[in-house]
Amino acid sequence: IWVGMISVVLFSACKTGTSRSLGEGNRGNPLPDRPNILWLVTEDMGAYISPFGDSSAVIPNLNRLAKEGVVYTNLYSTSGVCAPSRAAIATGMYPSSIGANHMRTSSYSEVTGLPKYEAVPGPDVKMVSELLRIHGYFTSNNYKEDYQFNAPVTAWDENGPYAHWRNRAEDQPFYSIFNFTTTHESGLFEPYGFRNIEMRHYHSGDTTYKWEPGNLTEEETPVHVSKDQEFEVPPYLPNTPIVQRDMWKLYNNISEMDNQVGAILAQLEEDGLLENTIIVFYGDHGGPLPREKRLIYDSGLNTPMIIRFPDSWRAGTTDDQLISFVDFAPTLLSLIGEKPLNYMQGQAFLGDYQAKEERKYIHGAADRFDEVTDAIRAVRDPQFKYIRNYRPNQGYYLPLAYREQIPTMQELLRLNEAGELNAIQAQWFRESKPKEELYDCLADPFELHNLADDPAYQDKLKDLSLEMDRWLTNIGDTPNLPEIDLIHRLWAGDKKPTTADPQINISNGKVAIESDTEGASIGYKLINAIGEQSASWSIYKKPINLKKGESIWVQAHRIGYNPSAIIKQNLN
């Protein structure tokens, strides 16, 4: 049973009648021809759960997923923060190759003096959710987006706090995402209390359920983990009562998120969909604590992933292959039997088009975060990580107002000012950085001992430096490029481009639509004679048959551009 706060639903499942293999290296495993795909995405999630060695949180649902699925130990985000990483997930491209690397593109302009802008991928790039819609899938997102660009109206069948696979057509396969924000770093702020909106997961899809703004009080917030427990603290943080309280909040938040995950999975079982659904749980980057989030050490990039496949395939096993967020989009296509698109910079790790060789490296980047800017790049193989600092005269720690609401961050600053941090804890506050860093991530998992100047490791340093050069050239990344120059490059000028209005042509009872903007997605809605319209926008693929008295709304949108106006035309 999946364990949730509101209800426990007993097992009920059905199986599809046809199947495919999960790809090379996965022979003998049946996969439904059109598998449903359910993503359970939590925020700011380091390896703080028992399938990854930490048993402090109470997570019966994730433990069941791990028992019935595959634990992936080496998943890495492309950035230590959400929006750039989510851009990689949505497109299959590295954020710094499409202008999505600064956090965020559309905020803090009053501090930076920069215009608001969006990432601008090439004209052939579509969100992977739109690609799945094109292939007949119902796609829903509940409900965070945050891609560094505004999603076109064609991206989702449903997007919002009530979005749910239950709203699809009968027997239509689905790709549904549920986002859980209880584990976000803001969940460590004081006063402590769960966000009311997150309680929607216990009523998922129920449009009659409403929630109050703001948070529960601490007295109202469920206690899943004892406040009296003594928690292990990472060596880069001081072990003080303030930090212990933040560790309790972290584990209590994870335990609450597990309950919410259980509520969604209970609905999946209730609908009889467990055995033709691929369930993927992962975090949007590493942990929420200082010296975790926003950094490109493993504490900021490495995040848990568990995948449960139909029919208990590889149940209870561990997979240590390197996986990057840019691999998600090609893998989604591969799992539904479609070839990944050429522009995608990742590779499929499952499905019909699984890459013949496992990934040899993962890559990461850190640039502007809110009001402060750095320029760091990283490459990691299964054992070693190489980091290149493009602003070595600038310290590691940068004063970020949002992060300084975390009591642990305030404690670090207080103890640093008083000279009471030990040598490891004080590393982050050095006023300059070496140009290069090299870490043995197996012997030194917290990346505290830089080997870049050690003669014994010069061959590895050179190898990873060459790999970084290859990667930067391949994706067109120019680290430390002034952000205003990046904006002008994306816009091909000093003004944000706007998608051309779609042109509607009616002939012989059919509507043909086109846009002069290369690569624009075109969405449309049909409105019948009494004004009824569909809830979602359809993707225009070919001329549309008309019905007498209908009218049509059309919008074109290339990712990163302003969308066109909505063109409305009566079809009488």
Region roles according to the model:
Residues V3-I6, R20, A452, K462-L466, ...:
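Short, compositionally stereotyped local motifs that mark structural "simplifiers"
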Residues P51-V58, V71-M93, N101-S107, N141-A151, ...:
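Short, solvent-exposed turn/loop segments enriched in Gly/Ser/Thr/Pro and often Arg
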